[in-house]
């Protein structure tokens, strides 16, 4: 069944373009709201989730307690790698969501790392 909608805070699998230019299926956290998705015919923004911690200053370890159900592997939000997708690019949904209080924390870290710079 084709995906017609995703929700803010949902973890989905999408074809993510990585910094080296390769495109690989990866889990990602939907960070944009539903209004954008409705207004732009299915467009949404998501932040990369990886099992590798290559960018220590930009990653957040994901704790099982932050989710409604745990991921299959130890993983990290890679807060500086964000991309746009369309709902028709979603490869898999697993009904996994980041709890609201942790969603706000992750978004704050994305803003700090991408827009506001790191505090010294």
What are these regions (language model features)?
Residues 4, 67-120:
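C-terminal terminal-subdomain/extension
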Residues 16, 33, 81:
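Residues immediately flanking
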Residues 17-21:
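Short, charged beta-turn/beta-strand-edge "cap" motif at the junction between a beta-strand
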Residues 22-25, 30-66:
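Compact nucleic-acid interaction/catalytic patches
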